[in-house]
A protein has these predicted regions:
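Domain-level signal for Mg2+-assisted phosphodiester chemistry and nucleotide/NA-binding surfaces
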Residues: 1-107, 154
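Nuclease catalytic cores that cleave nucleic-acid phosphodiester bonds
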Residues: 86-197
Length: 197
């Protein structure tokens, strides 16, 4: 008889996940050639766990572009969000990116703060047995330390196999789920149209 899966939450740092996916794609293939399914990605992570878990909530944090400046990219972002919302476990917390006219690029503003708050409040909420942060961004070390050491839900990490990261707590027994190319195949579909990465 198998044990009943315990409730977990997945906190996704979207652009870090998209940036890191290239570490499991064939060399030279950009991240905008695959479309990630957040629900299936959570299920892949749950299957890798050393105990039965289920993700009751999946929160995707992302910055979005200016719809007036880049309407096609904005439409692509909104279509992606609508697809993810087909899974009732998924919620998206988006914040407007700041456009830098000197570099013609966007910069995320407030997304990292929202992720850190989500990690810490979810860990302490009493609603989950565990919270998994899918990111390799070392800027989250202070929030990770707080959430990992606080009483309440266990905290774990997820990232792509081979994705460079300094997001770690030396000397601690912090569990990390490493997703490889086979895992990517289970939680993505090829994307033949213009992407956002």
């Amino acid at each position: 008889m198998s044990a009943t899966p315990v409730p977990f939450k997945l906190v996704v740092d979207l652009y870090n996940v998209l940036d890191g996916v290239t570490s499991v794609l064939p060399w030279g293939r950009p991240s905008n050639t695959v479309e990630l399914d957040m629900g299936r990605m959570a299920d892949v992570i749950a299957a890798k766990s050393n105990r039965p878990i289920r993700f009751d909530e999946i929160t995707v944090h992302m910055g979005v572009c200016d719809p007036r400046r880049h309407p096609q990219r904005y439409a692509t972002e909104q279509a992606m969000i609508r697809r993810w919302h087909r899974d009732p476990r998924v919620s998206v917390r988006s914040r407007p990116n700041r456009f830098n006219p000197e570099t013609s690029t966007y910069e995320e503003k407030g997304v990292d703060t929202a992720i850190a708050l989500d990690l810490c409040t979810s860990q302490a909420s009493g609603r989950f047995d565990g919270v998994v942060l899918f990111s390799a961004d070392a800027d989250f070390v202070p929030a990770l330390e707080q959430a990992y050491r606080a009483p309440g839900a266990t905290v774990q990490l997820a990232r792509w196999k081979g994705q460079p990261s300094r997001l770690w707590l030396p000397g601690e027994k912090l569990w990390c789920h490493y997703l490889d190319e086979d895992d990517l195949a289970q939680c993505s579909t090829p994307c033949t149209r213009w992407g956002i990465a």
